[in-house]
Amino acid sequence: MAYKCARCKRTVEVDYEYAGVRCPYCGHRILMKERPTTVKRMKAI
C-alpha cells in the first residue's frame, strides 16, 4: 500500500515486516494514506 510522507511529500511503500514505520528518504514518522484517483458517484435520495 502506498503512503505519502508528511514532510518530503514522496510516495513510500511500507514494509510491514520491519518494526518501525519511517520514510526512507527523510526519516519522518508521519505517513498519510493516499486516496484512490477514482471518483465515487452516489445517487442523491
UniProtKB/Swiss-Prot annotation:
This enzyme's EC code(s): 2.7.7.6
Keywords: Cytoplasm, DNA-directed RNA polymerase, Metal-binding, Nucleotidyltransferase, Transcription, Transferase, Zinc
Subcellular location: Cytoplasm
Cofactor(s) demanded: Zn(2+)
Gene3D superfamilies according to UniProt: RNA polymerase ii, chain L
SUPFAM superfamilies listed in its UniProt record: RNA polymerase subunits (SSF63393)
Cofactor mode of binding and number, as noted: Binds 1 zinc ion.
Superkingdom: Archaea
Reactions mediated catalytically: RNA(n) + a ribonucleoside 5'-triphosphate = RNA(n+1) + diphosphate
GO BP: any one term: DNA-templated transcription
Any one GO cellular component localisation term in the record: cytoplasm
Location, primary (coarse class): cytoplasm
Binding-site positions, Zn(2+): 8, 23, 26
Disulfide bonds: none
GO molecular function: DNA binding; DNA-directed RNA polymerase activity; zinc ion binding
Family affiliation: Belongs to the archaeal Rpo12/eukaryotic RPC10 RNA polymerase subunit family.
Physiological role: DNA-dependent RNA polymerase (RNAP) catalyzes the transcription of DNA into RNA using the four ribonucleoside triphosphates as substrates.
Assembly mode: Part of the RNA polymerase complex.
Name under which the protein is recorded: DNA-directed RNA polymerase subunit Rpo12
Source organism of this protein record: Methanothrix thermoacetophila (strain DSM 6194 / JCM 14653 / NBRC 101360 / PT) (Methanosaeta thermophila)
